[in-house]
Amino acid sequence: MKAKYLLYLLITPAVLLFSSCTDFFEQDSDHVQYTDDYKLTEPGDTIYALTGIMNKLQALGDRTILLGELRGDLVSVTSNASADLRGIANFDITDDNAFNSPKDYYAVINNCNLYIARCDTAVKNNRREYLFKKEYAAVKAYRAWTYLQLALNYGKVPFVTTPITTEEQANAQYETKDLQGICQYFINDLSPLVDVERPGLGVIGSVDSRLLYFPISWLLGDLNLWAGNYKQAALDYYHFIATANGANTYFPVGAQYVAFYSANWNSFEIASMFNNESYSDSRKVVTMIAGDSIPSQGNYSQLRNYFNTSEANNYKVSITPSEGLIALSRSQKYCYMDASLGAKASPIIAPSDLPENKSGDLRLMFTWSTGNGYVNGKHYSRQSINKYNSRNIHIYTRTMVYLRLAEALNRAGYPRFAFQILARGVNNDVLKEYVLPYCHTAADSAFVGQFSFPSTANTGYIVRDITSNRSYNTMGIHSIGSGWTEYNPYYQFPTDSLVSDTLSYQIEKVEDLIMNENALECCFQGTRFYDLMRVALRRNDPSYLAKRVYARQGSANVATEKATIRKDLTNPNNWYLSFKGKIGL
C-alpha cells in the first residue's frame, strides 16, 4: 500500500483515555487498512506521508495564534467577534467552541506516530547515506511541537507515542503527562537528532518547504526553557543561530527598524520591517504553517479577516490592539541620534505627546493603521495589521529566537548578556566589553565563552556604530522601534545599591524588559499568553499573569475586565482548556 493513502487516514479513529473512540478522533468509513508489517521504504511513500502530516498541521494554524494572543493582554475582541473568539478572550471556552478540538492535535500526533513506527531509517542510498533520516527527524519535531501545544493549552494530556490502529488499542487506557513530563520526554527524544538537516522537498505549491519545518535546536530551546533548564535552553537557541544557514554561518538580528528621519518627528525611514516569506540567509520567517489558498479547501486561514477590514468580513474586524498594548508602546522613550554628526551626536528624546501613535516605540504605529474607508458610498472604519497579509501562519521569526535566547540567558544568571541583546546587539567585541568583565568565576567565563558571534569589517555580526559608515546587520532589538537604544539614558541596565541580592534583582528587572520587548516586537503573533504564563510559573506568582490580563483594557478598567472574564486568573487551573472532562486539569 502506498503511503499516499495515509492522507485519507486519521489513522483508525480512537480515543486515548477513559472515553469512547469518538472523543478525540473522528470516525472515517473511508479509511484504508494496512498490514502491521508495512514499512515506508520508498522515497515517494515518505514524501506523501510527510506532506500528509503538514496537511493535518494546517488545522492547528489559526488556533495557535488565537489561543496564544486572545488570552493575553495585547489585544481586545470587538463587538463583531464571534462567540468562539469572545469565549477565548474571556476564558470561557466551552466544549463546542470551534477552537477547542483536541482531536485535531491527535490527528497530527497519530499520523506522526505511524510515520515514526513505519519509517525504515536503516535504508541507505548508493552513497551509504541514510535515506529517510531527515524526514524522520522532521516528523519527530512535528510531534514534539504538537504535544507542547497540547500541554500549554490543556495542562495535562493523554500521552501516546505508538500508532493506534485497532479498536483494542483505542479502548486501552494510556498515561497522561503534564507540561514538565512532555518537555522531559521530548528533550530526550529530540536531542540525538539536533544536527540532522531538514528535508529538501523544494517548493510545495508556492511555498518554499524549508519554511515548513520546526528546527530541532530551536524546539529543544523551547522545551528546556519551559522545563527550567536555562543554560541548556540558551545553548540550544545559540545552536540554532549558529547553524541556521549551515555549519559555522551567521544569522544576525538584521538591520531592520522603523525610525524618525529627523528630530522634526514628522517623517520616517523604514528598513526591512516586513516578514516576507522568501527563503534567504537573512530570512525573517523561520517556520510557518501553510494555509490553503481558497476558503473551500477547508484549512483556509481566517486570521487576515479577524485582524483586517475587508469585503470578506463586511469591513468589520474582530481583533484590535488593546489599551494595554497602546499604553506600553506609548510609554517607551524614543531616542534619536543625528548619525551625520558621528561621535558628536547626542541623544534627543522624542516628545511624549505626538499624535497617531508616534510617541514611544514606533513598531505599533508601523504595524497597525486605521482610518476612514468608503465602499459603495458607505463609510467604514478601516483597520490593517500588516503582520497578517498572507494566507500562511508564521510561528517562528528571527527576532523571536533572539528574545528567547535573552530570556534563557537572563534566567541562567547572565542578565548583562541578555540586556545587550535588547540594547546594543551582540558580537564578540560586545561580549568582551560588556559581559565577560562581570563573569566573576571561571565557570561563568567558560559558559559565556561557548557563545561566539564573530565579526570582521564586512562579515559576521557587525554591530552598528554611529562613528562608522559601514553597513551593519546587528542591533539591539529594542532599537527596532525605539531609536538608538545604546545611547538612551532611559534604557539602562538595572542597578540598585540598596538591594542585597543584586543578581536576583537584576534578573527580575531584565526579565521585565524582555517581556515588554516580547510585547512590542511579537504582538499579534500568538505568543503573548504563553510568555506571561512562563514567567508567572517560574516566579510562582500567578498574579503576574492575572494583573496584566485584567488590565488589557487600561488600568482604569480593571474591575470591568474582571467582571467580563469572570474567572479568577490567580488560580492557574483557570488558564487551561478542558474538553468533555477527558482532557485538561
Regions found by a protein language model. Give the residues of each.
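Bacterial Sec-dependent N-terminal signal peptides
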Residues: 1-31
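Membrane-proximal, proline-rich intrinsically disordered regions
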Residues: 21-70, 544, 552-585
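Conserved, well-structured interaction surfaces
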Residues: 47-48, 82-154, 174-181, 191-203, ...
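Short coil/turn linking the two alpha-helices of tandem helical-hairpin repeats
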Residues: 151-158, 226-229, 413
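Surface-exposed intrinsically disordered loops and tails
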Residues: 179-182, 196-204, 248-276, 348, ...
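Elongated scaffold/linker segments in the mid-to-C-terminal portions of large proteins
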Residues: 246-432, 443-447, 511, 522, ...
